[in-house]
């Protein structure tokens, strides 16, 4: 064992074992976890690759475009819109499965009937948020600034609220891991703080949801670098939360029975 631990990370034996472990890890995931993680990976790569391509091509300043500005110019705009649309569609069955699992767990826990309604509220909010998200990424910011701002705002608000509702619901499930609840709580609060800081750091006289329209098409990204930073933090906070908490909830679950 000591001899193995002393091997450098690039040693073929260690690399083979690491590769086998990753295959085993993926193989041992449930169908629900695979769909969830593929959805999250698709969304993450769509954002990061679109940013890298846009900056490399000189379409955007490195510090810092808003996420929606990545949709202005191809090829990153095509990748951004198509990838995030696909991620949104993939999330729909995940929300439904999550609702079904929590419903069964709440009933098994003899939870008050109102929490069944809160769970229903959760999935309805999640689906409305998803539809808003899909509309947002298919209504280019430079062509449809107002519809884009409205749907983006609805998506962000609902995402934070459904995170809060999820915390209230899972607290009523017997033996639900307290560490998962704590992660949900911390990341949900981080999302609210990021949204508040975004609103507080927008340039004077500019509405947060319609920043692009108020500033004009040729503005410098540096003007809204801080609001953009908090927007990116909101998105990645949500993705981290989904990864760490929903992987627990989707354990052993199938999307297609």
Regions found by a protein language model. Name each.
Residues 160-176, 195-204:
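Alpha-helical transmembrane segments in multipass membrane proteins, preferentially the mid-helix core
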Residues 24-43, 181-190:
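Alpha-helical transmembrane segments and their helix-start/interface "positive-inside/aromatic belt" motifs
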Residues 80-93, 157-168, 233-245:
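Hydrophobic cores of alpha-helical transmembrane segments in multi-pass inner/ER membrane proteins
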Residues 143-155, 221-229:
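Non-cytosolic membrane-interface motifs at loop->transmembrane helix junctions
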């Amino acid at each position: 064992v000591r001899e193995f631990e002393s091997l450098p990370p690039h040693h073929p034996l260690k690399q083979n074992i690491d590769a086998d472990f990753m295959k085993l890890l993926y193989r041992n995931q449930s169908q629900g976890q695979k769909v969830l993680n593929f959805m999250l990976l698709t969304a993450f790569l769509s954002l990061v690759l679109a940013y890298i391509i846009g900056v490399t091509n000189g379409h955007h300043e490195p510090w810092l475009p808003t996420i929606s500005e990545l949709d202005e110019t191809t090829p990153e705009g095509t990748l951004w819109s198509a990838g995030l649309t696909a991620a949104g569609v993939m999330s729909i069955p995940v929300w439904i499965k999550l609702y079904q699992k929590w419903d069964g767990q709440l009933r098994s826990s003899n939870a008050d009937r109102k929490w069944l309604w809160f769970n229903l509220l959760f999935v309805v909010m999640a689906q409305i948020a998803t539809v808003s998200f899909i509309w947002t990424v298919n209504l280019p910011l430079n062509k449809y600034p107002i519809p884009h701002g409205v749907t983006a705002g609805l998506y962000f608000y609902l995402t934070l609220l459904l995170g809060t509702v999820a915390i209230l619901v899972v607290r009523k499930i017997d033996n639900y891991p307290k560490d998962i609840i704590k992660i949900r709580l911390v990341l949900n609060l981080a999302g609210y703080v990021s949204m508040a800081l975004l609103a507080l750091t927008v340039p004077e006289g500019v509405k947060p949801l319609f920043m692009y329209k108020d500033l004009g098409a040729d503005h410098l990204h540096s003007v809204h670098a801080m609001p953009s930073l908090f927007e990116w933090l909101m998105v990645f906070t949500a993705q981290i939360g989904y990864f760490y908490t929903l992987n627990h909830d989707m354990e052993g679950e199938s999307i297609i029975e």
